[in-house]
């Protein structure tokens, strides 16, 4: 296969027409993006200045407020005017207004470089003007709101301490006025005095309550002696004559101590009086407990049948030729209607003492009386 070479005419044509090759390469340049659009350099510059509405501006809230105030005609704006400027300048803030508007209010109130100026005409129109502090005019370097200088706070003297010679309401408050007190030489002027306060009420000095005087030592000794006497009366018993004498004697020394002692000594028993008056004396001893009941009596004294057996004479011996009847038969000498032996008189001193101490002895069951009753019933049956 033979190699083909270009003809001289073609090579010469390529060397003689370099400009035509450049013109052919120019259409290969990338076309401009549709976002930027054509229309000359002026259109591209305006598109670069307009921010993207979907992107948050890189400025702090302090910078946004300062920017709005500086670009206003009077160098001051109300809160609503600041809101309108930020929304018109940065469309990003058209949504979620509640969040960033609260931040704007907080920065206006807490930052010292913003000064509140009241409106003319009093309270007829709502809202106040906000302006920049002259000392903070250059807080942004050369108009660059992204870089903020550190500002030194202006020196403010600390509030003076309260002094007795100065009134809290100022000179107007000391004079009894009802207007707003101004800070002067006579007062601080922090508060406006109320209308109902008068100069006489503010200038009067009210005395402090005095502490009670201590009780003298002699009164303490008398109270201790009265407590000891009341303890002795309580130990003796409420019904003893010594207790009544002690209660009468307590009325004298206790009356000098206080009204409680006088009332208690007249109406309460000695034990209760002692609980109040025994300030310095020893504690009162409790009354002794009552004695325990005696144990059941083990028959130390003879019963009535014992006394009757001891006092009855021995039986008389039988006559000549008379035989003693058997145990189950009655004697002819003894009538059938013979009454049972009478009980012994209760005039014996031992029996009276036993019944007085133990009444249950008189009602105690005894086998002797059962035997006599059975014998009497047997005699009545035999007589029938």
UniProtKB/Swiss-Prot annotation:
Keywords: Differentiation, DNA-binding, Isopeptide bond, Nucleus, Phosphoprotein, Transcription, Transcription regulation, Ubl conjugation. GO terms for cellular component: nucleus. The modification Phosphoserine is found at residue 33. InterPro entries: FH_FOXL2 (IPR047515), Fork_head_dom (IPR001766), FOX_domain-containing (IPR050211), TF_fork_head_CS_1 (IPR018122), TF_fork_head_CS_2 (IPR030456), WH-like_DNA-bd_sf (IPR036388), WH_DNA-bd_sf (IPR036390). Residues 283-297, 312-329 have a biased composition (Pro residues). It comes from the Eukaryota. The keyword Membrane does not apply. Transcriptional regulator. Critical factor essential for ovary differentiation and maintenance, and repression of the genetic program for somatic testis determination. Prevents trans-differentiation of ovary to testis through transcriptional repression of the Sertoli cell-promoting gene SOX9. Has apoptotic activity in ovarian cells. Suppresses ESR1-mediated transcription of PTGS2/COX2 stimulated by tamoxifen. Activates SIRT1 transcription under cellular stress conditions. Activates transcription of OSR2. Is a regulator of CYP19 expression. Is a transcriptional repressor of STAR. This is Forkhead box protein L2. The gene is FOXL2.
């Amino acid at each position: 296969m033979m190699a083909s070479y270009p003809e001289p005419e073609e090579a010469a044509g390529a060397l003689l027409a370099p400009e035509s090759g450049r013109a052919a390469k120019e259409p290969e340049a990338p076309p401009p993006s549709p976002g930027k659009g054509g229309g000359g350099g002026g259109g591209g510059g305006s598109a670069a200045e307009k921010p993207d509405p979907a992107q948050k501006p890189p400025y702090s809230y302090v910078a946004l407020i300062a920017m709005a105030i500086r670009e206003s005609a009077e160098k001051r704006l109300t809160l609503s005017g600041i809101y309108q400027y930020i929304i018109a300048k940065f469309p990003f803030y058209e949504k979620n207004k509640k969040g960033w508007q609260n931040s704007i209010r907080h920065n206006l109130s807490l930052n010292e470089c913003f000064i509140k100026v009241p409106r003319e005409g009093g309270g007829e129109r709502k809202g106040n003007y906000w302006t920049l502090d002259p000392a903070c005019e250059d807080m942004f370097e050369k108009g660059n709101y992204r870089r903020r200088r550190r500002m030194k706070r202006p020196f403010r003297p600390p509030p003076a301490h309260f002094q007795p010679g100065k009134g809290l309401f100022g000179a107007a408050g000391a004079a009894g006025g009802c207007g707003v007190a101004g800070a002067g030489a006579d007062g601080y002027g922090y508060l406006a005095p109320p209308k109902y306060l008068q100069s006489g009420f503010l200038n009067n000095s009210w005395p402090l309550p005095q502490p009670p005087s201590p009780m003298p030592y002699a009164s303490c000794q008398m109270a201790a002696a009265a407590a000891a006497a009341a303890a002795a009366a309580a130990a003796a018993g409420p019904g003893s004559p010594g207790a009544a004498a002690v209660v009468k004697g307590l009325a004298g020394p206790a009356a000098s101590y206080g009204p409680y002692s006088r009332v208690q000594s007249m109406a309460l028993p000695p034990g209760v009086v002692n609980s109040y008056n025994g300030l310095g004396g020893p504690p009162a001893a409790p009354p002794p407990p009552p004695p325990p009941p005696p144990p059941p009596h083990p028959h130390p004294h003879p019963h009535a049948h014992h006394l009757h057996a001891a006092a009855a004479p021995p039986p008389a011996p039988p006559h000549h030729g008379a035989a003693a009847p058997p145990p189950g038969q009655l004697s002819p000498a003894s009538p059938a209607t013979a009454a049972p032996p009478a009980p012994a008189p209760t005039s014996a001193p031992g029996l009276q003492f036993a019944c007085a101490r133990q009444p249950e002895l008189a009602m105690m069951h005894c086998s002797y009386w059962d035997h006599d009753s059975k014998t009497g019933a047997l005699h009545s049956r035999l007589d029938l």
